[in-house]
Amino acid sequence: MATPPPGVSGGGVSGGLFEADAPRPLADRLRPKDLTEVYGQDHLIGPQGSLRRMLDNKRLTSMILWGGPGCGKTTLARLIAEGSGLVFEPLSAVFSGVADLRKVFDRALSRRQGGQGTLLFVDEIHRFNRAQQDGFLPVVEDGTIILIGATTENPSFELNAALLSRCQVFILNRLDEATMREMLL
């Protein structure tokens, strides 16, 4: 049996990125820790980017992040929550329903009454039907939550107009070869 290279499980080096018993998935361990580590989205988080200005001015609004798989929607939402001091509540529209939303809304309302804000991140938000999407309206309008919805589908076709009118839509770039090369070097 061949010996794995150093840094790989069984290679004698603990803490390697590819270690079999590592506590978190590789993608999670490599996830950017702050906005300076995010690649390919300078139009949003660069010095003149819309999201950068929102964060710098502490004027965060509800938004929809639209982009292909792997472009950084979830990572960006986590970093926005950390940078804004809001409690991050992640949900997947694939695995969640109205009951899950109500629980999050109740926790967010309790936090709000205590002076703490909540950022609700909904992955695959386009998977919620129109009635479920309407459930966000009162809590977005009254400031109970800041909503960040992530979608790979065109929000103009997949999200209802009432929700879209209360959110800014940001388009995330696909990571091209040059960007991926830059990330590796």
Model-derived segments and spans:
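Walker A/P-loop
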Residues: 2-6, 10-19, 53-91, 106-109, ...
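Dynamic helix-loop-helix/coil hinge segments at AAA+ ATPase domain boundaries and subdomain interfaces
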Residues: 22-47, 90
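Short loop/turn elements that form and flank the Walker-type P-loop nucleotide-binding site
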Residues: 31-32, 45, 58-61, 71, ...
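Conserved beta-strand position immediately N-terminal to the Walker
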Residues: 36, 63, 170
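Short glycine-rich substrate-engagement loop in P-loop NTPases that contacts/grips substrate
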Residues: 44-49, 86-119, 130
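Conserved catalytic/switch belt of AAA+ P-loop NTPases
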Residues: 52-56, 122, 126-155, 161-165
